[in-house]
């Protein structure tokens, strides 16, 4: 006897929650899959990555109105020469530092924002 999809859905809908849980467990075992991993993989992975992140990238989004002060701040933070710092600021959005600790990233962001730049930490 072969059931149509609609008949199968109706049969599942008539079951209690505990019966559905048992059905899911039996299907996971039979097919060697995990329904929980498939359903919650993307949100759980994103949350875990956000909690475990130890390295951050500081991105200069915009130089702002006071470009000279931002160039000075970039030079001080990165050790670049004047021309390289100017080119970096003018090419915004651009990565200033990558793979740094959260406190270092936040300190750099604060320093650049005080100079007038718009900064993102990723």
From Swiss-Prot:
Protein function: Forms part of the ribosomal stalk which helps the ribosome interact with GTP-bound translation factors. Is thus essential for accurate translation.
GO annotation, cellular component aspect: cytosolic large ribosomal subunit
Gene Ontology MF terms in the entry: mRNA binding; structural constituent of ribosome
Superkingdom of the source species: Bacteria
Pfam family, one: Ribosomal_L12
Keyword Ribonucleoprotein: yes
Upper lineage: Bacteria, Pseudomonadati, Pseudomonadota, Gammaproteobacteria, Pasteurellales
Subunit structure: Homodimer. Part of the ribosomal stalk of the 50S ribosomal subunit. Forms a multimeric L10(L12)X complex, where L10 forms an elongated spine to which 2 to 4 L12 dimers bind in a sequential fashion. Binds GTP-bound translation factors.
This protein's UniProt keywords: Ribonucleoprotein, Ribosomal protein
GO biological process, one term: translation
Family label: Belongs to the bacterial ribosomal protein bL12 family.
Name recorded for this polypeptide: Large ribosomal subunit protein bL12
